[in-house]
Curated annotation (Swiss-Prot):
Record-given protein name: Cytochrome b
Binding annotation for heme b b566: H97, H196
Cofactor binding annotation: Binds 2 heme b groups non-covalently.
Family annotation (CDD domains): cytochrome_b_C, Cytochrome_b_N
Record has Electron transport as a keyword: yes
Misc. comment: Heme 1 (or BL or b562) is low-potential and absorbs at about 562 nm, and heme 2 (or BH or b566) is high-potential and absorbs at about 566 nm.
Pfam families for this protein: Cytochrom_B_C, Cytochrome_B
Cofactor entry: heme b
Organism: Geomys bursarius lutescens (Plains pocket gopher)
Binding site for a ubiquinone: H201
Subcellular location(s) of the protein: Mitochondrion inner membrane
Length: 379
């Protein structure tokens, strides 16, 4: 009689994905973040579901309903802070996951990579509409400023903005539809994550050396289930430390003031995980140019497979490209800091230089470094 996990139609899918999956024997801890993103997604959907049971998407009661959740609902404060900080954890894991993909050349699995970019865009959209829901000052003004960027689109811009708003300003209609989007998008993300996995399992995982490992693959279970479980424990420890000891560290104090259309906060800024893109957008003095730069800051990732010039896949043995990669990481941290600063000297020029450097490294310097390293290999 066949083993049930190999014969049962449902168990067979799980078996091929998580048990008997042939996996490279040498993948490092940087490969843990895929499973950690899955955990973050489940955490966000569960905490979000419980929050949705008590939240009301009406401009008059939204802020009060969040206060009610924190004060009156059993462990409501915990669920709310888990959800808010879970988003930060999600993006930290997401950015490390993308960084790993760039460092080890995983972007050469084009279908998996492109679906990953789509997942990133959807996650950013989900986080943006979710940030509007508590209806605090930064929620309201963040929504106003970011949606207003669409008005820069020629001809249809203004109509598009009013269509998204459901009126002539961010109001009740906007809040209601943003709540609807925030509810449905994670379910779309879950479906796309499965497609992401499907394409990954067509090719098999990459590894730190960037070379084929078919001859030495090991089953996913027990080796990588154990390893992933260790990652889960470490992530949850950091998560609970953040939620229980530093619950408001990553939030904005302005969001504890109810939304007031008549009073603009001195510095309007999105959540920390969007600041790098916000800084790139702000560094261009033209509105349409800023919107294009904002989009390109993410979509530039889609060009990486076509800009790969090196004979080696991974950066493990490429010192020039390695240096550029870490300069890129430092540049992104710099952009994140600049995005949170007011628009005044010297922050303007720092943001502009950092933005140019970001595109320069990805579009020109890394492909050039790949060609130089190819030459060095011949010496």
């Amino acid at each position: 009689m066949a083993i049930m996990r190999k014969s049962h139609p449902l168990m067979k899918i799980v078996n091929h994905a998580f048990i008997d999956l042939p996996t490279p024997p040498n993948i490092s801890g940087w490969w843990n973040f895929g499973s950690l993103l899955g955990l973050c997604l489940v955490l966000q959907i569960l905490t979000g579901l419980f929050l949705a049971m008590h939240y009301t998407s009406d401009t008059l009661t939204a802020f009060s309903s969040v206060t009610h959740i924190c004060r009156d609902v059993n462990y409501g404060w915990l669920i709310r802070y888990m959800h808010a900080n879970g988003a930060s954890l999600f993006f930290i894991s997401l950015y490390i996951h993308i960084g790993r993909g760039i460092y080890y050349g995983s972007y050469l699995y084009t279908e998996t990579w492109n679906i990953g970019i789509l997942l990133l865009l959807l996650t950013m959209a989900t986080a943006f509409v979710g940030y509007v829901l508590p209806w605090g000052q930064m929620s309201f003004w963040g929504a106003t400023v970011i949606t207003n960027l669409l008005s820069a689109i020629p001809y249809i811009g203004q109509d598009l903005v009013e269509w998204i708003w459901g009126g002539f300003s961010v109001d009740k209609a906007t809040l209601t539809r943003f709540f609807a989007f925030h509810f449905i998008l994670p379910l779309i993300i879950t479906a796309l994550a499965m497609v992401h996995l499907l394409f990954l399992h067509e090719t098999g995982s990459n590894n730190p050396l960037g070379i084929p490992s078919d001859c030495g693959k090991v089953p996913f279970h027990p080796y990588y289930t154990t390893k992933d479980f260790l990652g889960v424990i470490m992530l949850l420890m950091q998560f609970l430390t953040l939620v229980l000891f530093f619950s408001d560290k990553l939030g904005d104090p302005d969001n504890y003031t109810p939304a007031n259309p008549l009073n603009t906060p001195p510095h309007i800024k999105p959540e920390w995980y969007f600041l790098f893109a916000y800084a790139i957008s702000r560094s261009i003095p033209n509105k349409l140019g800023g919107v294009v730069a904002l989009l390109m800051s993410i979509l530039v990732l889609a060009l990486l497979p076509y800009l790969h010039t090196s004979k080696q896949r991974s950066l493990s043995f490429r010192p020039l490209s390695q240096t550029l990669f870490w300069v890129l990481v430092a540049d992104l941290l710099l952009l994140t800091w600049i995005g949170g600063q007011p628009v005044e000297p010297p922050f303007i020029i720092i943001g502009q230089v950092a933005s140019i450097l970001y595109f320069l490294i990805l579009l020109l310097l890394m492909p050039m470094a790949g060609l130089i390293e190819n030459k060095l290999l011949k010496w």
